[in-house]
């Protein structure tokens, strides 16, 4: 049978797909956003939409308001529910869309359902367990839909960049636990509550040792399998995430800068994610 492409959308705006999780659970619809440039680097879309691949009909699932933009949407693996990036409402010159100034939004597609903010944000001390201090990005569900992975950047570290003794902001990987809401203070106008308890599951270093597992940056995360994997000792790791980790390779370039490369790493998630480990949850 010859291969044949079939166009299923036609409109005067962009149609951008996330690189995973765009199909509805029943395999009839594809979800997308409407950012204006093909590369998706300009975050200016205001709609989350879905197209029915059977007849080409298009439905607007969500439209952002008050100057906010939205995009990078993925579908729940077995429910009529989506999650996507949402920029700040009422943006200002000092608080507009950016890597550390965005959040996840979950939308149940049942009639009458209201969108809910995924991740709480607390920008003032004392910090709150389960709340982030910045922005989440590219949200993907685990195979059973019980967890949501995302990448994360810290707004407070962005603001303090260059301060002696303060680590710089570096992208990391986090996980949200739906159904465990987090409430924060109203001491900062951009604080907000979230429907999920969030934790950062990677660790980055300000100065990484060459040829070590010290990480400078984490990105491009992906859930492993539908039920994790079995490790070398025969132990089932039911929840695990693979990601790209940036590491130094021990040589300098022509500008005298330490060269780095991205390696593949795996993080095995504990059964109780909301329990503090070597670092606090706040």
At which residue positions do the language-model features occur?
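Sequence signature of WD/YWTD-type beta-propeller architectures
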Residues: 1-282
């Amino acid at each position: 049978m010859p291969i044949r492409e079939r166009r299923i959308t036609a409109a005067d705006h962009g149609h951008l797909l996330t690189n995973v999780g765009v199909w509805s659970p029943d395999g009839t619809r594809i979800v997308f956003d409407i950012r204006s440039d093909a590369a998706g680097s300009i975050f200016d879309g205001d709609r989350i939409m879905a197209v029915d691949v059977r007849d080409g009909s298009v439905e607007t699932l969500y439209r952002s308001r008050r100057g906010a933009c939205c995009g990078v949407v993925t579908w729940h693996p077995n429910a009529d529910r989506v999650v996507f990036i949402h920029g700040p409402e009422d943006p200002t010159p000092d608080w507009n869309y950016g890597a550390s100034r965005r959040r996840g939004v979950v939308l149940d597609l049942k009639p009458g359902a209201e969108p809910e903010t995924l991740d709480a944000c607390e920008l003032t001390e004392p910090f709150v367990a389960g709340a982030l201090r910045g922005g989440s990005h590219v949200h993907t569900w685990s195979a059973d839909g019980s967890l949501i992975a995302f990448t994360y950047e810290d707004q407070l570290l962005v603001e303090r960049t260059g301060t002696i003794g303060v680590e710089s902001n570096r992208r990391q990987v986090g996980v949200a636990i739906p159904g465990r809401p987090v409430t924060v203070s109203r001491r900062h106008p951009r604080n907000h509550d979230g429907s999920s308890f969030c934790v950062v599951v990677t660790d980055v270093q300000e100065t990484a040792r060459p040829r070590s597992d010290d990480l400078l940056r984490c990105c491009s995360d992906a859930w492993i399998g539908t039920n994790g994997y079995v490790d070398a000792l025969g132990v089932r790791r039911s929840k695990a995430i693979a990601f790209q980790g940036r590491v130094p390779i021990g040589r300098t370039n022509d500008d005298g800068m330490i060269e780095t490369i991205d390696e593949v790493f795996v993080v095995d998630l504990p059964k109780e994610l909301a329990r503090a480990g070597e670092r606090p949850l706040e």
